[in-house]
Each structure stands twice: as C-alpha cells, then as structure tokens.
Amino acid sequence: MTVPYLNSNRNVASYLQSNSSQEKTLKERFSEIYPIHAQDVRQFVKEHGKTKISDVLLEQVYGGMRGIPGSVWEGSVLDPEDGIRFRGRTIADIQKDLPKAKGSSQPLPEALFWLLLTGEVPTQAQVENLSADLMSRSELPSHVVQLLDNLPKDLHPMAQFSIAVTALESESKFAKAYAQGISKQDYWSYTFEDSLDLLGKLPVIAAKIYRNVFKDGKMGEVDPNADYAKNLVNLIGSKDEDFVDLMRLYLTIHSDHEGGNVSAHTSHLVGSALSSPYLSLASGLNGLAGPLHGRANQEVLEWLFALKEEVNDDYSKDTIEKYLWDTLNSGRVIPGYGHAVLRKTDPRYMAQRKFAMDHFPDYELFKLVSSIYEVAPGVLTEHGKTKNPWPNVDAHSGVLLQYYGLKESSFYTVLFGVSRAFGILAQLITDRAIGASIERPKSYSTEKYKELVKNIESKL
C-alpha cells in the first residue's frame, strides 16, 4: 500500500546531513547535563530527605489531592501572579527568547521542548536540525495507517488518537531493549529515541484523524524543510501562514502545565512503572479526553454560541452582564473563567488575545470574547464564589481556531494532546535519566481515616 505523505521522508535524511553543524544535538547536550542533575537530586534527597515539607488536610485527600506536594516536575511551575513558567521563563520571556521560524513572530514548539529538557535556549541551527530530525521520524507503520482508516468515523477523535499512539508500541525501542536486559543507565537513551519518534509521528496521526473524520481522508506529504507546526497545519489541509503562526503559539503555550493535572500525572504514573513512552502518553491522552480536563475550550465555544444566539448580536455591557448573571444564577459556571492557582488573567490568554488583536480585531467571535472579558471579572467578583475571576487559556483558544476554519470543536482536544506531549515526554526522559521511583502512595478506607482523625483529635 502506498501512503502519499510517507514518501517525502526519504528526503529528510539528506536534508539533515546537508544542514548539520558542529553544534551539539539535543541528545548530546542532554547527555552532558543529566548526570550533573541526577547527582544533584541524589545529594539533595540524601541531605534533606527527612525534612517535612507539608501538612495534609483530610479535605485535601477527599478533594482530589488538590494542593498536596507529591510529585517532581522539572519543566514548569505555576506562579499565582506570573502564570506558568517554563524552566523559570514566563510566556512573555519565551515569546522573546526562543528561536522562531523565518518571518514568524511566534516561538517554535521544538525550541520549547529543548528548553524543557535542558533548561537552555537552543540556537537557531539547533532548533532547525531538531525540526528536521522530528520530521524524519514521522512515517507511520502500515498497521497504524490501516487501523486509523478502519476506525468508525463517529468514534471520538481523542479515542482514535489514543488507539493510534497505543498501537505504536510495536515500534518501541525502549520496550525491545528492556526485554533484552539493558542497563538502567541506558533507560533514558532509549526513552529519548522513542519520545522523538513519537513526537515526530503525532502531527501525521492528528492530521490523518482529522482528514478521515471530517474530510475526504486524503492528505498531503510531510515537508522536510518545514517546522513542526507548519507540517501539522499543512497536513490538516491549510496553507495559511497566519494559521501556521497561531499553531506555533498554540503548541508552545499549551505544552506543559506542571505535573499535577490529569494528563501529566497519569503519564508520569504509568511511566514510573517503566511503560514505554507510547503507553505512557496514551494513558495521559485518555485522561485528557475527560470532560473535566481537555474539553474546556470546546465547552467555551458551545457557551459562546448559545450566548450569541440569545443576545441576537447585541454585545452591549448590560446585555452581556445579564446573560452572565443568568448563567450563574442557574447554578452553572462561566466557562473559561477561574483557575485553581492563578490570581490574575492567564498570560496564555493574553498571548492569544494579542494574536487576535494583531490579526483579526474585527472578527465577530473575538469581539464577543472581548466584551465578556470587560464584564465577567466584575460579575464574578460580585458573585463572590471564585478566588480568581479572570479568564484562563481556554476562554480564547477555540475562537482562534474557528477563525482559521477549524470549525470541528471535537478535534480541538487532539491538538491539545499534540501540544501536551512535549511537556510529558520531556519529563519522562528526565525521570528515566535520574532513576525516578515507581509511584506508590498510601491509601486508606473511610473507616480508617475516621479512626486516624479520632486519634489525632483526641490528642488536641
């Protein structure tokens, strides 16, 4: 069977060779960094391992373990004021500091992956070679192509995404090497290769799902000279350079968000059992598919369209305010507003807002989002039931995708999954490099907790 988009990969190896430089590759640089980091971790735990770092409340245990420090995640930390920081850098920092494609104003997600893994900003040449390396790995095995082609079109795109990634387990270099008895010191190297193989294949998988479910099933070819986001957009079926630039921004700002969210934690948990990157990421994608995690931007759009129909295009302050109060008084929330940690407007929202203002300030849905932004924080503050009345990233992302013709909101979580893979896989490589332990927290029954609480309270 001939698959058109696979043919171009024969050209990628020659592209890599002709564009190679004396600068270190990502794997070479990581191999220099991780032994130092691993030793630092060992020494830190040795010296301070008995230090108590937190008290846990019963309500936290029953409240989804919210706020309990119980995991290590190197790539990002969420600051209540500055928002997400990638290796210490804010959204504004990475937009300024990370390499960009020629003529683009947005950072390349490949550059962020380098930053997440090493803590360093790569050079332009290093990122271009990483882009080419990823695209050289994009070819799907025939059984995965056939599998996707045979899935029913009404099967949710996220289910198809997870199935395809799981089926790629057949290609796992780590699983094969582990079965042959490799040394623990080599775990990270095979995990690295699997992770880059998987990252390279994700745009093809995502685009194939989109073309199969929503279009005619036909796809173009991977372009070895194009960056990651451009290949993704082109394979989906668009040649709009502004859409490509949006996708660079989208993939970058959605790539990592600490390790406690469902997709990151699930992948970390499964990976701690030494499951391959394919199985680890697939588990996270299944978590991301849950409506409480990855469906938020789709729910925002559904709510916006309902609002738009209700107000008959009257976006005045009074009309918007009334609709917001009606939403809250009916026991519902305003989707896209509020955050568990942030106490100000999500910088990711602001980055997307600026993109919209620069490219389509008169787009009707954007004007509606802007009107809500002017009114909602005041309404939520007066309502008094949220600690953060400001918009988060989900309040905006779906509107931008709508503008560029990607109308099928059930596909949006697939794009979220492609993006989140950068952060998840960077941490998995790091976990294998430092010899992270398998997760095994303690659980109790409610009766046992009652007993514990009774004993504690009797001593007060």
Swiss-Prot record:
InterPro entries: Citrate_synth-like_lrg_a-sub, Citrate_synth-like_sm_a-sub, Citrate_synthase, Citrate_synthase_AS, Citrate_synthase_euk, Citrate_synthase_sf. Its EC number is 2.3.3.16. It comes from Saccharomyces cerevisiae (strain ATCC 204508 / S288c). This is Citrate synthase, peroxisomal. Peroxisomal citrate synthase involved in the citrate homeostasis. Catalyzes the condensation of acetyl coenzyme A and oxaloacetate to form citrate. Citrate synthase is the rate-limiting enzyme of the tricarboxylic acid (TCA) cycle. GO terms for molecular function: citrate (Si)-synthase activity; identical protein binding. Pathway: Carbohydrate metabolism; tricarboxylic acid cycle; isocitrate from oxaloacetate: step 1/2. Citrate synthase is found in nearly all cells capable of oxidative metabolism. Present with 2310 molecules/cell in log phase SD medium.
